[in-house]
């Protein structure tokens, strides 16, 4: 019963998936066959597969050498972080999907700058990341949620007084906020089977309201930003 409820809620919540929006942003750039996209932190290649299916010259990079080997065996173009450092290739598009929330500010600054150094002037960066929520830290290695305003303060060439200044400059071109159903969170019945299933049934109702209202009755829990690299 619990598994059935979870599946129904999962189907009801996806009015428009994040993956679809990422592909829409990439498609809007109308990349030619000579242009290249780098998927940073590509993991299992879940983003690489549909991107390459669009006919785009896409390469993945990840710190996990085991995953990179599996991706290669599956026919995906990938390299490890160490292999990437040995190259001097530049790219037209960078994709950072669910990456930045795993870094503290100082480390994120250097991480992003190291990749933005390899983004061509006029090229684009796509960031997909969650916002703060009661379940942000369900992911054990989530460190900090980041807002578009915060990214702009450090990477947008802002003259505001901040602790960090990036050596690269990016400007926000487009923005999409991900939404999901309202839901109960801190109830024992959501975690332990022996407790009442009422919270799960209430969450099912809230997911249905989210769907019927086309996402109006819900909350924002993440965002995708399309940025362009510009001269400082």
Residue positions per predicted region:
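Pocket-edge positions in alpha/beta enzyme catalytic cores
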Residues: 10-14, 100, 143
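S-adenosyl-L-methionine-dependent methyltransferase catalytic module, highlighting the catalytic core
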Residues: 46, 63, 93-96, 103-120, ...
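Conserved N-terminal segment of class I S-adenosyl-L-methionine
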Residues: 1-89, 93-95, 107-113, 218-227, ...
């Amino acid at each position: 019963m619990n598994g059935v409820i979870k599946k129904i809620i999962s189907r009801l919540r996806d009015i428009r998936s994040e993956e679809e929006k990422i592909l829409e942003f990439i498609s809007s750039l109308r990349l030619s066959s000579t242009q290249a996209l780098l998927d940073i932190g590509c993991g299992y290649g879940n983003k690489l597969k549909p991107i390459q299916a669009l006919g785009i010259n896409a390469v993945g990079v990840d710190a996990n050498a085991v995953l990179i080997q599996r991706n290669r065996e599956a026919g995906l173009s990938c390299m490890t972080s160490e292999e990437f450092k040995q190259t001097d290739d530049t790219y037209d598009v960078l994709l950072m999907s669910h990456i930045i929330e795993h870094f503290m500010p100082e480390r994120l600054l250097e991480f992003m700058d190291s990749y933005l150094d390899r983004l061509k002037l006029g090229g684009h960066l796509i960031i997909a990341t969650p916002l703060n929520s009661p379940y942000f830290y369900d992911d054990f290695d989530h460190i900090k949620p980041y807002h578009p305003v915060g990214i702009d303060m450090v990477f947008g060439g802002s003259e505001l007084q901040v602790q960090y200044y990036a050596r690269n400059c990016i400007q926000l071109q487009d923005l999409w906020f991900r939404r999901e159903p309202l839901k109960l969170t801190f109830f024992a019945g959501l975690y332990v089977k022996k407790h009442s299933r009422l919270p799960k049934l209430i969450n099912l109702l809230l997911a249905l309201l989210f769907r019927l209202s086309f996402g109006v009755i819900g909350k924002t829990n993440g965002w995708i930003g399309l940025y362009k690299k510009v001269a400082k």
